[in-house]
Each structure stands twice: as structure tokens, then as C-alpha cells.
Amino acid sequence: MDSVAFEDVAVNFTQEEWALLSPSQKNLYRDVTLETFRNLASVGIQWKDQDIENLYQNLGIKLRSLVERLCGRKEGNEHRETFSQIPDCHLNKKSQTGVKPCKCSVCGKVFLRHSFLDRHMRAHAGHKRSECGGEWRETPRKQKQHGKASISPSSGARRTVTPTRKRPYECKVCGKAFNSPNLFQIHQRTHTGKRSYKCREIVRAFTVSSFFRKHGKMHTGEKRYECKYCGKPIDYPSLFQIHVRTHTGEKPYKCKQCGKAFISAGYLRTHEIRSHALEKSHQCQECGKKLSCSSSLHRHERTHSGGKLYECQKCAKVFRCPTSLQAHERAHTGERPYECNKCGKTFNYPSCFRRHKKTHSGEKPYECTRCGKAFGWCSSLRRHEMTHTGEKPFDCKQCGKVFTFSNYLRLHERTHLAGRSQCFGRRQGDHLSPGV
């Protein structure tokens, strides 16, 4: 009978490797080792006066010393004790035939049972079981769970299965495809503007139920995190941290390709996909600008056409986005759901309400480093700083006039869209001057 090395059925770590394991990996190692000992006992090893629990206090030393006391040590092969040295040891049929069907693709270890390999694979930090290329001898159910390789019951040959995900639901407007009808319906609402979830407290509706539930917490007062800079209440700690960074200016996530920094990992991923990964194949016919997806192109084209999609049923005024329409409708209903508990003044919008609260507290945490003037809002400070720098980054593409803020530019562009012959604030015949 061929000898089988002890490492073939036991996971062994050196003292240096053991020190690098996390507590969860050490607990996993403990469980695997315990099962290994039990399996050894089941094939004929008699464990006398052995306290298994004490064994795990120092696994690296106790494991070797225990085997050495049972088997002795072969000269010149310090850690390759074999089953042939263990008295009354009878290997099972798999080991007698030499079949070792379970092999780890990471470190090369082989195991007699797939359960040993399954647990061993988890010990590899960051190794996903679905990526395992090892040889598995499993039931059909577990072959399906493994998802990478399956064994034919007739021939025993392994065949590779490449899973494919079909997306049968395709949007006719932008071409985006989905594999779920629910996600497809939610996406369609972004084009139609349909909002099925309506708030009973105020005139506001939502396309997605999760957004509706989050909004409901605003009325119940279920807000756990409040920003010390602006007083805005936020539901979740992750969103709260991102919001605080908008005040502090911290941008810990940096793009490795262009060096641009972002306040969250999600913004960084979006930037990497749109700016570096995707080919910008959608080109605007008006200005020639290229964008990565058709939906971005549709949004961009509205800036040229002045297209407004959402119309007020009472005054026929139209808006580009549904939230602007909902805010406008409050002017007709007279609804002012936000009330100050100090002076009783009411407001239409939560942003105006938060800004008003600072008039009572006198809080102005944003101070200009040049003149010392303080502001209650970070945006107000940024606007003020431009008066020192003279920065005017927004310029009109048609007449060349430059502006300090984008909203000033948008107001100016309407004069061109309306067909006026002169620019905003400039009489006909005046020379063009780049300034506000």
C-alpha cells in the first residue's frame, strides 16, 4: 500500500503564516483541523489521553508534536510523516486507489473529500469559490452551486460551462437592456416621468418605492444623523460621511489615470467608466461634443433645443425635470410644509428651511481666508471667493460673454433661444465685452 503524506489531508501553516491569519481564518483552521482528526480516528487511529481543545492553543506546534508522538519522525523528512507509520491505520477506498479528486487551484493541495477543499478554499484570503478551477467530485446539486465545472455522470469527463446572462428587456428610447421586468419598468419611468408612489403629506411623488420610504422618514422624524455645518438630517451613516465631505472639501478617492479626486468611491467608479473605460461614440450634432451613452446625449441635446418635458396642469408652464414641476405646483396649492419652531415661519422647500434656521443660530462656519468674511453656506463662500479671484469660467458659445456662475449663463442663453438680436445686458451696436 502506497504511503499518503499527512499534509494530503491536513492544512498546515508555519508560525509565520499563522501570524498573518485573521481571527476568522484561525477559527476556520480550527474547525478544519478538528474534522481532520475525527476522520483520522474514524479510519483506525486511537486517541488516548488527548485533549483536542488544548491542541488549538498553539496549532502550529501542537499539531506536529501530536503526529510525531503517534508516528515518530522519519530521518531527513521532518514534516512528511506518513499514514503507513501510524499503527492500525486503514485508509478508505479512495486513498487505496490513489484517487484524489479535490485539488486546490491556488496552492496545489489535494484532499480526499470535497468538504475539505471547500473549507480550505475559504482560508485563501480574497479567493472566491466561483473562480476555483479545482477538480471537484460532487453531487449534481453542488455542481450547480459551484457553477464553474461539472462532471458528466456517464463518462466522468469534466466540461466547462460558461454562464451567460440574457437581458431580454430593452428600452426603445435609450437602448439600455435589463434582465428583470421590474427593473425595466422602473427605468421606463425615467423617460415617461410617471411617479407611482405619492406622499400623503405633501405634493410629491417618486418612481421607486425605496425612495418613497426614505422620504416618508422626513415626516416621521426618523433622522439619526444631522450635519453640524448645515443642519441637514440624513438617514444613513455612509451618506452622512459623503455629505460632510461636501463641506470639508475632503476627496479621498483619486483617479489613477487623470488624478481627479472624488468624495466617494461611487463617484470615482462612475468617473472611471464614463471618462476612461467607455468609448464616447455618441456625438452631438449641434456642437460636436461626444458622450459615452445615449441618455447623456439626450440630456445634453436639451441644452440646445431648450426642450422642457413636464407641464403644469394649471398654468401650462413647462419644466425640464419633474422635481422642478413638483416644487412649482406648491405655488398653486399654497402648501408650505416646513415650519420653523422658533418664529413660526413656513417654507416650501427643505433647503430654504435649513438656510432660515441659521438666521436664529447665527452659525457661520465658512470664513474667507482673504478678507475674514464668514458665511453660513459653503456655496456662499465659493461665490464670494470668486469676487477676489475674478474668475468667470462660464462663457456663452454664441457671443463669447463670460459669467461667474452657471445660472447667470443659463439666463443669458435664453435671450439667444428666444431669437433676440442682442445679448443680455448689451444694447445693439455695442462692442462685445467679456464680462458680466
Swiss-Prot record:
Span of zinc fingers (C2H2-type): 102-124, 169-191, 197-219, 225-247, 253-276, 282-304, 310-332, 338-360, 366-388, 394-416
Annotated GO CC locations: nucleus
SUPFAM superfamilies, A to Z: beta-beta-alpha zinc fingers (SSF57667), KRAB domain (Kruppel-associated box) (SSF109640)
Gene Ontology terms for molecular function: DNA-binding transcription factor activity, RNA polymerase II-specific; RNA polymerase II transcription regulatory region sequence-specific DNA binding; zinc ion binding
Bias (Basic and acidic residues) ranges: 128-141
Entry keyword set: DNA-binding, Metal-binding, Nucleus, Repeat, Transcription, Transcription regulation, Zinc, Zinc-finger
Region annotation Disordered: where it falls in the sequence: 128-164
GO BP of this protein: regulation of transcription by RNA polymerase II
Leader peptide range in chain numbering: none
Pfam families membership: KRAB, zf-C2H2
Location of the protein in the cell: Nucleus
Keyword Cell membrane in record: no
Family the entry assigns: Belongs to the krueppel C2H2-type zinc-finger protein family.
Name used for this protein in its record: Zinc finger protein 101
Source organism (scientific name): Homo sapiens (Human)
Gene from which the chain derives: ZNF101
